[in-house]
């Protein structure tokens, strides 16, 4: 089967292209610009086009050999030239998870789904790492680059597939998981779910589609229906004391994974010690409190709960060296800011200095006014520590001064801040 991936270098589409390649399909595609993923795809012998994405390469590829599937991300506009051309050519068009669901079904794999508002990527990477360290063949897809393998991989000897099941655009409802690990349920993606009830009901449906589920009880009161095979852990008593990862949120997510894998028999008394050793040696995933330089970190977090969790983890590290914490924060999506503005309050208390950037705009509702930094920060308790800034050379000079004075600097956001920090460092 020949599959064309539009946006082949993205963190959602790129790993799936790798999986399709390893599963024996012919893979090609396009993207606007190169990335770490496109470099990895090139090394694997996959051909694709970098440039305009105006439909010309797609048409030429289809003339060379007919394309069976045109796969795209839910973020692709319906009037995108490639999507329009694919429909003009009469190609089967599908979003990412429709194809992945087919591959999982065709290969008769048991899906281990990592879902939830926060921590999906790190937890998916951790679960994959555990399988690898236990020498259990595994197929997987991770929404980030990792240091211990490709972002997406199909192993013909595996019985299981580990996947980051994203709730955006209701993508996770394409699947019927063998095991679902739900890290958290905090209202997000207002462009998909107009109300909190819509969001909760989607997770309710997801649980109903899962054979086994593990989650924290305090995250589930509004969506738990009392289905069988749902393991609800207690926050106060059930955090695994053998897990020593930095960051309480990481320890909680790892506890869920170990509990879930134990529930379905993958972890048992014979390999428990090795599994815990794997957890505690986990190297992390890119853009998840990833160190770029000594004392300079980049993190994907862009929700108040994620901000607080990451700064708590930064505090654990900074306290050992008596360091100040400097945060560079880029809010993500104006439509999201309209929904979470009221929640910005005490999440920033661990930062002695906060450089607040303009909101990164993506998939916006044109009817909404753009919230200013002043409007977004009016309820923050320590707003006297906030400095409004732009991603420019002046900011980088200030960050270098902070680093030279021994501060721990964290850049947070899902937009352009990560790329900017990498270029500067």
Go through each PLM region and give its residues.
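Nucleotide phosphate-binding/pyrophosphate-handling subdomain across enzymes
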Residues: 2, 12, 19, 108, ...
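Conserved N-terminal Rossmann-fold NAD(P)-binding element of oxidoreductases
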Residues: 3-8, 412
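Phosphate-binding loop of NTP-binding sites
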Residues: 19-25, 42, 55-65, 74, ...
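NAD(P)-binding Rossmann-fold cofactor-contacting core
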Residues: 25-40
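Conserved beta-strand positions in the Rossmann-like core of class I SAM-dependent methyltransferases
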Residues: 28-29, 139, 355
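C-terminal helical cap/extension that packs against the catalytic core
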Residues: 44, 345-405
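A glycine-rich beta-strand to alpha-helix segment
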Residues: 67, 393-425
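P-loop/Walker A phosphate-binding loop and immediately adjacent motor/lid segment at beta-alpha junctions
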Residues: 91, 209-211, 228, 311-321, ...
């Amino acid at each position: 089967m020949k599959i064309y991936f539009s946006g082949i270098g993205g963190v959602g589409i790129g790993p799936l292209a790798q999986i399709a390649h390893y599963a024996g399909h012919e893979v090609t595609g396009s993207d606007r610009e190169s990335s770490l993923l496109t470099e990895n795809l090139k090394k694997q012998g996959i051909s694709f086009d970098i440039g305009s994405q105006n439909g010309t390469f797609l048409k030429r590829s289809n003339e060379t050999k007919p394309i069976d599937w045109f796969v795209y991300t839910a973020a692709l506009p319906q009037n995108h030239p490639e999507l329009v051309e694919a429909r003009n050519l009469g190609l089967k068009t599908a979003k990412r998870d429709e194809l992945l669901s087919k591959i999982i079904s065709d290969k008769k794999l048991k899906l281990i789904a990592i879902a939830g508002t926060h921590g999906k990527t790190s937890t998916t990477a951790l679960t994959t790492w555990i399988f690898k360290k236990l020498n259990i063949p595994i197929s997987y897809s991770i929404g980030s680059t990792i240091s211990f393998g490709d972002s997406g991989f199909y192993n013909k000897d595996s019985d299981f597939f580990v996947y980051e099941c994203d709730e955006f655009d209701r993508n996770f409802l394409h699947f019927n998981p063998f095991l679902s690990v739900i890290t958290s349920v905090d209202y997000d993606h207002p462009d998909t779910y107009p109300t909190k009830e819509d969001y909760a009901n989607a997770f309710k449906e997801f649980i109903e589609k899962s054979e086994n589920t593990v989650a924290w009880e305090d995250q589930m009161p509004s969506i738990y229906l009392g289905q069988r095979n749902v393991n609800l852990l207690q926050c106060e008593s059930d955090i695994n004391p053998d897990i020593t990862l930095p960051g309480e949120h990481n320890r909680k997510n790892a506890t869920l994974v170990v509990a879930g894998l134990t529930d379905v028999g993958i972890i048992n008394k014979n390999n428990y010690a090795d599994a815990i050793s794997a957890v505690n040696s986990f190297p992390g995933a890119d853009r998840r409190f990833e160190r770029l330089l000594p004392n300079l970190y980049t993190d994907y977090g862009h929700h108040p709960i994620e901000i607080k969790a990451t700064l708590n983890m930064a505090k654990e590290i900074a306290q050992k060296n008596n360091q100040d914490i400097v945060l560079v924060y880029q809010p993500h999506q104006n439509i999201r800011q309209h929904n979470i503005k009221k929640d910005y309050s005490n999440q920033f208390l661990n930062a002695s200095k906060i450089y607040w950037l303009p909101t990164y705009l993506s998939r916006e509702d044109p009817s909404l006014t753009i919230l200013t930094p002043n409007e977004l920060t009016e309820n923050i308790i320590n707003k006297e520590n906030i400095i409004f800034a732009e991603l420019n050379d002046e900011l980088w000079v200030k960050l270098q001064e902070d680093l030279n004075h021994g501060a721990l600097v964290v850049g947070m956001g899902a937009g352009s801040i990560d790329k900017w920090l990498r270029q500067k460092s």
